[in-house]
């Protein structure tokens, strides 16, 4: 109540921000007459003037009014479009590291040019991030005319581009590309063996288009570069038959023993997206596996040697119970291709991880491809948080404002519309069955068709869109279908969707990137005419003129019929996706309407609100085919959606908390790798590692602060001779001295090792040996980092079980992952020292060849794949990583700290605990 009163007096935070921005808008508008007087060359010359002023110390904020005015004037001349005042506000929001929420049709693409131009003045690069290659190329070509006019270079970063073209794109002032490609390039840059092979510059400023889709919807799916692992394709084929022999249990057993409607061998947790075997199911599965010879007679599925079989069995159960053809994936060209649940697009080249994709391939009878080993991985959260400045824009972000602030520190600012919105959002209609719902949808579509009103029907799956298409065919209603299967015709279908009597069925419209203009999109249709090779220039001009004349009458006709009507056939689990569908109507103050038709069979209602709504229907004694249309029901559904959104937020937050630990380690490894790549001579680094290893060996046999009688000198001499080829007369030295300090013995060992090493270097020359040292270090870092990623993955999959021992899984993960990381550094140190110290050299040429073979072996890994991982809460553990003993871990940490670049005592601890290093793992040293 008090909050509401304060808002009335002072206005909301959003209103106060908009008011501040309007003051700057007035300054920009006042500059317009001044820049209108400039010639094209003088206007272009302003970019260089701004650059010089910025180099002289003037901030971007001080340049903003003039830069925005120049950009607007250039847009008027080149694009024939003048930025509205609300677009100027949007540009300022983007420059201030915030998210601009702008309604569909308000011109987000043009708005971004203001902030892009201003930040490109620094020369440090601006990345404009889109959801697919088509939009990246389209926007770069479209807006590139404006940037080129202003003297700025524009590049496009597409997948499968040649290396030189990628480098050129990144060296441009402005680079357009997809979130996946930017992320994969970062990972690839940290796998190169030559600094000149890197493509990215330091990450400066990024504007993320459809920011909610990229930073929220895709945040549960890390980017992964992987290579082939051990071949187990036959096992997937054999496991595929088992789910068919098991019966599904209906209902989940509660604590009091009730809840099971029909007993079975496994039950499906739709909320958690998991499958679990019942006790009877375990016994039956063990019996089947025993008959197939996969486990021994009387053996348990939980025996250590059978853990892998358990993993494959659960993958097969999930493939059969939770993943459905034409909803979650399609089958094309002997491949299973994932369908993006948020946009309905095909995600070619991406694969589910954890053996799930192979299980689906076995289920569908296509070729089962080998499992992969992770070579490099990063989440979008941690990639985008590396930019100095980050901003975003979308039509729907306000519902996720808390998450943007919490995870990314990005505030959402809702930008006012240029003209008042006129769309009418009607109450949801809820039916008892799916058939009743589709009958009502068809009636609504027919009514619109007869009145000449265009309709856009939104569905949540390919299966639904094709079913509805069949119903409309039966009713002889002409229509277009836009789903993952018709991806190639997407732009053409959307361009026509606003014409009178047009019926368009589409799987989720999120990120489609094309406006639906009432009367049809003249620009798009003109583009298709321009691209037609069969028409002469005169015919093209005549057809375009005819199109423009027709458009005005069609536009008025559609407006009179009520504008675009949106029909939703099901509520998505995210309110934001529903809002994106609704947002297709009523652009730029046009009329429009929307309505959702639901049934009690819908997944969202069935899981979260079905019983409550069914009870209301029964209480009201609703006759067959009669819908409920009441605010209380709509509120129940929105409450269910909020529950799902909250749960998904918790999953993303949990993923981030785990990935933050790996991220700190990733930064350290990549920093070490880059130091090795860029060092003129890695000799000093190798010497430090060698000395650290020898100190450890020495202290194993000659502990500090001990008496001479406690020293194991003969054992030390043996280890030095056998492992390192060093003959050091330690016993003889002790006998010949009246008293001796242990440090003197250590110095003797160090001196002998240095002499032997210097002798090897002298044989081939410092330059040749330095190249070999560099190759060995890079090989060791890469190999052990890959193994470490696999260990972290296994650790995370089983860590939730620690909760049963009254331990905090997150803290346990942080502790054990740090111990694993200390062991990783120790392994790198020992391997580099052993290989470089014991290498047998005959000639410089031989050494050079060895270096080349090492680099070639690692830089040409077979069957590299780029994919999004699937992260689901509560995945079955595959194989818990063995927990390093605390004593060994302490020693490993000590060695690692001695041999690797040191963490400052007051720096944050790399384990991710949030404590200072000296108060956490620094105590080990």
Swiss-Prot record:
Q: Which GO terms describe its cellular component?
A: cell envelope Sec protein transport complex; cytosol; plasma membrane
How does this chain sit within the bilayer? Peripheral membrane protein
- Cellular localisation: Cell inner membrane; Cytoplasm
Is Iron one of the keywords UniProt gives this record?
A: no
Q: How is the cofactor bound?
A: May bind 1 zinc ion per subunit.
Cofactor(s) this protein cannot do without: Zn(2+)
Q: Which residues bind ATP?
A: 87, 105-109, 515
Q: What is its EC number?
A: 7.4.2.8
The protein's annotated catalytic reaction(s) are:
ATP + H2O + cellular proteinSide 1 = ADP + phosphate + cellular proteinSide 2
- EC main class here is translocase
Q: What CDD domains does the record tag this protein with?
A: DEXDc_SecA, SF2_C_secA
Summarize where Zn(2+) binds, as residue positions: 909, 911, 920-921
Give the family from UniProt: Belongs to the SecA family.
- Free-text function comment from the UniProt entry: Part of the Sec protein translocase complex. Interacts with the SecYEG preprotein conducting channel. Has a central role in coupling the hydrolysis of ATP to the transfer of proteins into and across the cell membrane, serving both as a receptor for the preprotein-SecB complex and as an ATP-driven molecular motor driving the stepwise translocation of polypeptide chains across the membrane.
Tell me which NCBIfam families the record gives.
Answer: PRK12904.1, secA
Q: Which HAMAP family match?
A: SecA
Please describe the quaternary structure of this protein.
Answer: Monomer and homodimer. Part of the essential Sec protein translocation apparatus which comprises SecA, SecYEG and auxiliary proteins SecDF-YajC and YidC.
* Name of the protein in question: Protein translocase subunit SecA
Q: Which organism is it from?
A: Cupriavidus necator (strain ATCC 17699 / DSM 428 / KCTC 22496 / NCIMB 10442 / H16 / Stanier 337)
The gene behind this protein is: secA
